[in-house]
């Protein structure tokens, strides 16, 4: 957990607020559990806020349908746990202003949010003063070993692996699901749209990519996918994962991406599986070491969005070969439409 400002907890506050972003689940969520623990100590109710961008950049109907299916389930499970859930459609490129308005409505004693490795210190500072004098804490709930503990950018799996392995025993434990002492009472003055697939109609989304009906969003679907993977495919993971014609991978990526299942839940289930050790270890290498290497890169490399972030030798190589003759040249549309000479590329598309 990171304290983002120096404000004291407001004794006049009426609740604790958890601003959900990357960790979109009601179970096995370290940030949510931290918020519950704080609410219980303060003897206050807990409410979760989620901001939906009306004009999300680079998002389409498939992404948002999957995400909203998960949010609908999350909202239901939170209510079952006597925790409030408020969603707001937010104009502009950020939900910060809408969240500030929400905080003015509910007057929190404390705000807890998901850690975001892409959010630079300057952005955290701006957010921390949106709703003074409320303290702001962030919790790294999307990885197993908190990314802040690694302190600097790691350049390869071989450098980050021993650092993660040294801390795994400390952090790879069941998250648990506490009970709240003071239930949230709905207030009709606090507006929140119903969270369902129909909500996508109120957002400006790219409709050229239809929902993937074979993938349904939500923690229940994620847990079912995890059980199927362990039962049917984990034992062939090493031999089959790099063959696109063999269904050997976990199919958990979209659920991990939207935080609908946590890496703790997956890793503990894989550890306890009856599959061969080499298959279990290979999967955990990808899901823990390689995934957290990517998070480390985004957290500590300020130029992670551009080619300027790559190593100098790689940039030199690209420049040296920029004018090399190519046997085939394709437009972006041809590549996307699988109109190339390469059957493997075409099959992947």
Where are these regions (language model features)?
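Alpha-helical packing segments of well-folded alpha/beta enzyme cores
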Residues: 31, 70, 74, 222-229, ...
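Short, glycine/acidic-rich beta->alpha junctions
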Residues: 27-31, 119-120, 247-248, 279, ...
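Charge-dense, low-complexity intrinsically disordered segments
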Residues: 22, 61, 65, 213-220, ...
């Amino acid at each position: 957990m990171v304290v983002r400002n120096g404000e004291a907890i407001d004794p006049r506050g009426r609740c604790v607020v958890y601003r959900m972003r990357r960790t979109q689940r009601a179970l096995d969520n370290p940030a949510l559990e931290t918020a519950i623990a704080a609410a219980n100590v303060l003897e206050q109710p807990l409410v979760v806020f989620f901001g939906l961008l009306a004009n999300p950049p680079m998002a389409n109907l498939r992404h948002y349908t999957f995400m909203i299916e998960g949010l609908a389930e999350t909202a239901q499970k939170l209510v079952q746990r006597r925790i409030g859930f408020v969603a707001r459609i937010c104009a502009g490129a950020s939900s910060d202003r809408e969240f500030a308005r929400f905080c003015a409505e509910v007057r929190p004693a404390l705000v807890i949010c998901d850690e975001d490795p892409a959010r630079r210190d300057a952005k955290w500072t701006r957010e921390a003063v949106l709703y003074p004098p409320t303290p702001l804490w962030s919790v790294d709930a999307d990885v197993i070993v908190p990314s802040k503990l690694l302190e600097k950018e790691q350049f390869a799996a071989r450098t980050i692996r021993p650092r993660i392995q040294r801390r795994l025993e400390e952090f790879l434990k069941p998250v648990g699901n506490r009970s709240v002492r003071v239930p949230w009472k709905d207030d009709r003055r606090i507006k929140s749209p119903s969270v369902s697939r129909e909500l996508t109609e109120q957002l400006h989304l790219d409709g050229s990519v239809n929902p993937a009906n074979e993938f349904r969003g939500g923690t229940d679907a994620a847990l079912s996918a995890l059980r199927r993977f362990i039962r049917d495919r984990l034992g062939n993971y090493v031999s089959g994962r790099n063959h696109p014609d063999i269904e050997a991978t976990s199919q958990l990526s979209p659920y991990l991406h939207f935080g609908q299942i946590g890496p703790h839940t997956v890793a503990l289930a894989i550890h306890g599986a009856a599959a061969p050790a080499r298959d279990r270890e290979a999967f955990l290498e990808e899901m823990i070491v390689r995934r957290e290497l990517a998070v480390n890169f985004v957290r500590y490399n300020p130029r992670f969005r551009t080619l300027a972030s790559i190593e100098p030798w790689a940039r030199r190589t690209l420049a040296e070969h920029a004018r090399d003759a190519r046997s085939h040249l394709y437009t972006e549309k041809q590549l996307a439409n699988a109109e190339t000479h390469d059957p493997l590329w075409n099959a992947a598309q």
